[in-house]
Swiss-Prot record:
Similarity annotation: Belongs to the bacterial ribosomal protein bL27 family.
Species this chain originates from: Coxiella burnetii (strain Dugway 5J108-111)
GO cellular component entries: cytosolic large ribosomal subunit
Lineage, top ranks: Bacteria, Pseudomonadati, Pseudomonadota, Gammaproteobacteria, Legionellales
Protein name as annotated: Large ribosomal subunit protein bL27
Gene3D superfamilies, alphabetized: 2.40.50.100
Keywords noted in UniProt: Ribonucleoprotein, Ribosomal protein
Residue span of region Disordered: 1-22
């Protein structure tokens, strides 16, 4: 009878699913209300004007407009805001 000894167990062999983090809309791009701008862990980017932040720190637009990235404050923190589109009047 052919016999094969038992192989040792391994401690590798698992991997987590990708989380698709990062900037989704860049500076100057037009966005609609509700569009996701940044998906992140923690607050690398902070919400500025016309921006909302979800409980997982996702930043999203509250109004239609253009995305603007700025650094401000004494610690030069990154803020993302939405500039409203200017209405052209005839």
């Amino acid at each position: 009878m052919a016999h094969k000894k038992a192989g040792g167990s391994t401690r590798n062999g698992r991997d987590s699913n990708p989380k698709m983090l990062g900037v989704k809309r860049f500076g100057g791009e037009r966005v609609l209300a509700g569009n996701i701008i940044v998906r992140q862990r923690g607050t690398h980017y902070r919400p500025g004007e016309n921006m909302g932040m979800g409980r997982d720190h996702t930043l999203y637009a509250l109004i239609e407009g253009k995305v603007k990235f700025i650094r401000k404050g004494p610690k030069k923190r990154n803020f993302v805001s939405i500039e409203p589109l200017e209405e052209s009047q005839p």
